[in-house]
């Protein structure tokens, strides 16, 4: 897994975005999230258990706690009430991307290089639209996937342009769980150390 810095990720645009009502909601809440130090991952309306607005987000360092979810929920709820993009009663659900997360930014592919991914494209890439395999390299325009189950006669390696990507998600494995927990622990420790430094700096002033 490759590391990416918080500064590089703070204003990085998403490769995969919403359409329709989901897009309208995303446009409303994303500036609020950015001001709080979070990045929007995905917005999705769901009809399960009534109408549910699912907002998936994370801090710029990739972490997300229960307290963070509560903070985001309290911040975006009044904004949604004022803008009123949804004309029906709904339940707001704020969550982290999870370990088997959606991949929506180029930095996601860099960070999780070496792990298994499943994805779909909006156009045919080497004769198909669905792929599964390990991320082996990433450049400005796309990523290279080493398929773990290539069909007979197919090359294992395939290059997928970011512009063709319609959906992508990590596949849960023991290795992914281990690396994700390690990365989360390191990021939270770094954030705590930075907060302590800022407090000490204020005390000196």
Curated annotation (Swiss-Prot):
<dbReference type="InterPro" id="IPR028998">
    <property type="entry name" value="RimP_C"/>
</dbReference>
<dbReference type="InterPro" id="IPR028989">
    <property type="entry name" value="RimP_N"/>
</dbReference>
<dbReference type="InterPro" id="IPR035956">
    <property type="entry name" value="RimP_N_sf"/>
</dbReference>
<dbReference type="GO" id="GO:0000028">
    <property type="term" value="P:ribosomal small subunit assembly"/>
</dbReference>
<dbReference type="Pfam" id="PF17384">
    <property type="entry name" value="DUF150_C"/>
</dbReference>
<dbReference type="InterPro" id="IPR003728">
    <property type="entry name" value="Ribosome_maturation_RimP"/>
</dbReference>
<keyword id="KW-0690">Ribosome biogenesis</keyword>
<comment type="function">
    <text>Required for maturation of 30S ribosomal subunits.</text>
</comment>
<dbReference type="GO" id="GO:0006412">
    <property type="term" value="P:translation"/>
</dbReference>
<dbReference type="Pfam" id="PF02576">
    <property type="entry name" value="RimP_N"/>
</dbReference>
<comment type="similarity">
    <text>Belongs to the RimP family.</text>
</comment>
<protein>
    <recommendedName>
        <fullName>Ribosome maturation factor RimP</fullName>
    </recommendedName>
</protein>
<keyword id="KW-0963">Cytoplasm</keyword>
<dbReference type="InterPro" id="IPR036847">
    <property type="entry name" value="RimP_C_sf"/>
</dbReference>
<dbReference type="GO" id="GO:0005829">
    <property type="term" value="C:cytosol"/>
</dbReference>
